[in-house]
Amino acid sequence: MIDEINVDARQRMEKSVLALRGQFTKIRTGRAHPSLLDSIMVPYYGAPTPLKQLANVIAEDSRTLALTVFDKSAAQAVEKAIMQSDLGLNPMSAGTVIRIPMPALTEERRKDLIRVVRNEAEGGRVAVRNIRRDANGDIKELLKEKEISEDDAHRGEDAIQKLTDEFVKQIDDILAAKETELMEV
């Protein structure tokens, strides 16, 4: 039973770390990366459609993204959606190809982004700790119902704590890498 709780906690913690990685990819670093545009929705025939369903996005070089729009009639809507996003990008259209130069980040903007990244990481840590709390609560419930011994309960809580420490360290490592990436000029 403790093993099941442990496996469940591990899976939930892995999902939290994955979600954090996903949030970090959306934070612009001044380097062109196709996943930067993943969150953009384009109004297409009256329905909000993910940008990656309407265009092929590639990194032309380290500072330019190139989009090849599949449907020429959607090119203007794609360009407008990119401009209206909160990413601060200014696309240039040439027919069905839209080029997006990545503006260099100012020192102030870098510091703001680092603050945002740290807040996101703290949110990830809190999520992992909440999972630990839930798992420990499940273990205490089993102990209360006399389904496990006190020794088993302590071993289970220790295992959950080790798991928590492992995932918090992963989050800290991801944060350090992102901060380094943001501070590169």
UniProtKB/Swiss-Prot annotation:
InterPro entries: Ribosome_recyc_fac, Ribosome_recyc_fac_dom, RRF_sf. One of its GO terms (biological process) is cytoplasmic translational termination. The keyword Protein biosynthesis applies. Belongs to the RRF family. It is found in: Cytoplasm. It holds the Pfam family RRF. This is Ribosome-recycling factor. It comes from Pseudoalteromonas atlantica (strain T6c / ATCC BAA-1087). It comes from the Bacteria. Responsible for the release of ribosomes from messenger RNA at the termination of protein biosynthesis. May increase the efficiency of translation by recycling ribosomes from one round of translation to another. SUPFAM superfamilies: Ribosome recycling factor, RRF (SSF55194). NCBIfam families: frr. Keywords: Cytoplasm, Protein biosynthesis.
